[in-house]
Amino acid sequence: MYYGHEPHDWGTSSSTSDMKECTICEAPSNGYHFNAASCSACAAFFRRTVTLNRNFVCTHQNTCRVNYAMRVICRACRYHKCINMGMERSAVQPRRDCNAGRRKIMYNSTNSLKTQEHTFAPPTPTVPQTTTVIVTKDERIYEDSSPEIHYAQSYSSSISEEISSLSPKISVSMCSGTDITLNFEAEQVLEDLLREERLFNERRKLLYCSNSCISELLTNENANEIPYSQSNLQPLTFAGIQKHIRPQILVIYEWLRGWRHFELLNIKDKSVFLRRCVLYHTILDPSYLSYRLGLPEKFVMFNGMYVGVQDGDKTGWEDEKDCITADLKIKLYRPLMDRLINEVCVSMKVINLTFVEFVLLKALVCFKSSTTCEVSVPLKKFMNTYMDTILRALNVHYQTLGMTKEDIAQRIGNVILMMSSIFAVGMECLESHQKIQFFDLWQLDDLLIKLIQRGGGGANY
């Protein structure tokens, strides 16, 4: 567990070690999967393709570009590149036969009707010998989606109450085939979240790295982990924060739109979800950047600006004429920064939080915080099911790393334990900024005020 009180070494950690490049999609990778240097996303794609025995046909003469930053990747070209780069179908474990899934559950005729009212019997999984899918660049098909996902795609202006039947579907796994299907869905969720985080980082890099040359902006080095390098960091000015708040809200909104069910939500649910994402991105992104780049000397904000952490270091805490005084800066934000460092950044360092863990932690926090607010009941149920899938994705990720069940349980527990501290800091952040707005202590962005003045106080964590 991470709640010890021993001194913390903020030197280079394993999470910052050199990363090899995935030979398929060019994303950073630190290992081999199926005998080829690849990232976990390409490994998951190859495993699904082989296990389900799928064939893809490219409509563009197999010349499509395959890159991790693309929203839609041609699956035919991606599979061919996996083979060309050395991945072996024989290295994938064959799909286990699921006899239990084919057995019918027998009930007494007198009780069958009552049983059917309360018991969900999962359909027998049927897998054709070969499935051919025509793939174009302009379409995005989730062939491995579960019944929950198919239902969500038919979600209109409000979710039907039928979604209440989704919750039991995860818990009634009756055969290994069902487990395999759920694992495929979890891998797809992980792939989606990793892709959106990479795009999120690339957008921030283009928006905020004003001193970088074009070649530096376009490089893919470490792009899926942190958007900045030490040379990009600049002393913080509150005027700069004012200028960059709205672009940051925009890139958070784009991250949110990457969730494939977001456009199916009604306006009220979208609004609540956006508020929670803005709040917790504002907490988690600086914490992770500081853990990776800044501490123990610097606390790095979302835009690459930093303030001094050590006593006596006035960097970023100076007076700013016509904006905010040094005393007000320290009074309003120094306690919040200290709490973030001690309760979030230190925890990240102690457990040596990896990029994949950070991505899934951020998704869990955003979804969980939304379910504690006034979202519709059907959406709340669906989000709870989706969080189960995120946790399953984390478990599958650990399994691909060869971790034991005991290590996996401890690791997941450490990640989940971080959430309570993050929620507590979130509530303090809301209260602090509501006071700033109420007493007009300094000028906040109007859109930010609208996002934090509602939906923040009624959450119970």
From Swiss-Prot:
InterPro entries membership: HNF4-like_DBD, NHR-like_dom_sf, Nucl_hrmn_rcpt_lig-bd, Znf_hrmn_rcpt, Znf_NHR/GATA
Pfam short name (any one): Hormone_recep
GO-annotated cellular components: nucleus
ZnF start-end (NR C4-type): 22-42, 58-77
DNA-binding region: 19-94
One of the record's GO molecular function terms: zinc ion binding
Residues in NR LBD domain copies: 185-455
Subcellular localization, as worded in the UniProt entry: Nucleus
Signal peptide feature range: none
Keywords: DNA-binding, Metal-binding, Nucleus, Receptor, Transcription, Transcription regulation, Zinc, Zinc-finger
Record SUPFAM superfamilies: Glucocorticoid receptor-like (DNA-binding domain) (SSF57716), Nuclear receptor ligand-binding domain (SSF48508)
Similarity remark: Belongs to the nuclear hormone receptor family.
Function description: Orphan nuclear receptor.
Protein name: Nuclear hormone receptor family member nhr-121
